[in-house]
UniProtKB/Swiss-Prot annotation:
Pfam families found in the cross-reference section: Ribosomal_L4
Subunit annotation: Part of the 50S ribosomal subunit.
Protein name: Large ribosomal subunit protein uL4
GO biological process, one term: translation
Coiled coil spans: none
Region annotated Disordered, chain positions: 50-89
Amino acid sequence: MPTIALYNMNREKIGEVALDEQIFAAEVKEPLIHQALKVQLANRRAGTVKTKTRAEVSGGGKKPFKQKGTGNARQGCSRAPQYPGGGTVFGPQPKTYNLGINKKARKAALRSLLSMQLKSEKITVLDQIEFAKISTKDFAGFMKKFDLERSLIITEEPSTNLALSSRNVPYVKLLKADGLNVFDVLKYQNIVMTEGAVRLVEGALQ
């Protein structure tokens, strides 16, 4: 069974946490990670891009000039694609990019990622992350004490002080344990978790 050091906010080791080997020592399945990331990014797309065809552009009901006698090529509508302000030919239309993934596969992808991060020593576990007051300076000092830069902080339920202290610090994201996802785990170099969040994640990924 894998274990990891447990720290307090002063970076003092106060014990060890036993981790579920099914979650943190799982077989790494890169194709599943790729699939889960692809699905998550696709589902974020709004798909609302839209251009108007010649039938949808307002105006242009009148023939620009008579059919014959001007020397110009015949035209029937000033909103045709060759005119400035005319409609677009084969332009993008609204569509859904949504993809699906089985719950079992999504959980396996997260287990693979957490196992990779633990093996790379990118996970830090604390007994709690709590601040007595709202202070970006205190939070930045805490991050510096642990030599953390691009970090994903996962807690059971972020306190108001923690949320407000961290929100103005670049390259840091605060996340509830039940919101753990493939994109954020890949995006951030380090994962900081409370002991309670570890247990919630283990329960969710069984």
